[in-house]
Amino acid sequence: MSQDVIGILSDSHGDLAAFDAAYELLRAKGAQRFLFLGGRYSDLDEWILDRRERSRGGREYSGADFIQDVSRWLSVADQKPRPRALSGGFPAVTTPEENPLLVRESFLRAPERDCLQYRDPAIPRKILDMVGDTLCCAVHDKNDLERDDLVNALIFFHGRESEPKRVQIGPRFFLSPGRLAGAAEQTCALLEREDRDLRFSAWRLDGKAVLEPQVLPLERKTKVSAK
């Protein structure tokens, strides 16, 4: 059984139906955490809001809805905070209707260059995190990668590709889930960890594999450069 299962999606550009289909597909495949690589940073928030509005069936937001939301916020506030991360034990993901806060917390996302969040110094433009003992870097545009990123990380997730890609350059892997909008096929991807093995695959939204699951032959490093 996989110890970490990470769903990866990118470039939805307002197509909330595709975002929704990708989330449900990846969740059905066991994803516990999600990487949204940009291509309209706010789509995550709008998708959660859209799901909740549709769950009310057109009914207006009521006092009971408000009380329920406050109760959810308070229950989260009472919990011991834990840092967001790609790897580790996490609660089973749910739907935005059941627990929108848990769903949002299960995502890490990177902003694209033409969004306001890209210029916000409080929001990192890249995600650097460990999956098992492998340092990974996630970014919307791979041109934003810097020398230290390339020296230190072994796996790079990036958006802005018309189709899923699994490219090896030396010991490093550049992985893209493809696009949810603006491409011939709407696709997303999955990274699974079993012990020290990492397996990458990509999928159409109808569940057909575009890139079959394949273990990445990684060469682990013994030290990290910090300059």
Which residues make up each language-model segment?
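Core catalytic region of metal-dependent phosphoesterases/phosphodiesterases
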Residues: 1-132
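Metal-centered catalytic cores of metalloenzymes
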Residues: 6, 132, 147, 193, ...
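Active-site metal-binding loops of divalent metal-dependent hydrolases
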Residues: 9-14, 38-42, 105-107, 140-143, ...
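Conserved beta-sheet core of the metallophosphoesterase superfamily
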Residues: 85-86, 90, 95-97, 135-201
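A short C-terminal boundary segment appended to hydrolase-like catalytic domains
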Residues: 164-170, 197-227
